């Protein structure tokens, strides 16, 4: 990525380094940290120190878009300091942040510019541009419009837990998480990561919890749920702020609909939405979690990071246990713990083939 052009100079240009805990004034920073988590397991053959990672990421620091550049991404200090480190190590957890900038050019504006360029061509040559030439005119229109386009920025938090060899990306979509993971693996040679899989299907477990009315140990079922039928039309039933321990929910599941989202609370401290793809969304730290934490500016970042990751790490561990335990691809599944939720016999195969699919999606040999 080349140096930025056509943007405010000096300190104003560095305001992209939003704090890792960007937050509204009414909330403590840590309370809005990590709204979503996609979980990965780090490859066994990769290791690095904080200093080595920081040095590697420095070669891919964020630089804002140039005049005709549509998109830019790079690493920024998670603390929000203009010239701070790119890796923060707190309580054994490593925090990073990727900044993504995208120039926004509305499609209608592009079309209007293409039409204007096409009219010029027709006037000069006496013929209308063909399909191939219109594509070239579209590229030209974008180059003309990009210097005037508004730039949107999104900061994506990354959490490395080296002792557990886990990686978590705060992304609301798999595509954004893939983009972050690609940037991370490009910056850190030898790093590999694969999505965390569990021995039991999240959908099957959520269905069992709803039908039985029994949440797994340490969790409670909240008031939001989405049920979807697997047939071609994929009819969907959604419950929002609604009691879920009702016959109607159980009837939908018995009729074949599968839970794709379910709101849960862990230990009365962290609420979240679990998806059938093992994504953790809409994370919220509940009252009392940050009570007593330092409010001093110099200490707040460390305190909030330690508390937030200290809550989420055991919550993730309990969640994976509730789903039958983590299943490392290529290894035989461990026996489900005694406290694992019951399930229908067809929902989990007796053995899991060594494939690149999650255990619940693998086709038996």
Question: Which ranges hold each PLM region?
Answer:
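Intrinsically disordered, low-complexity, charge-rich terminal extensions
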Residues: 31-365
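Short, Lys/Arg-enriched N-terminal segments with co-localized hydrophobic residues
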Residues: 12-32
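Intrinsically disordered, low-complexity regulatory regions of eukaryotic regulatory proteins
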Residues: 10-12, 354
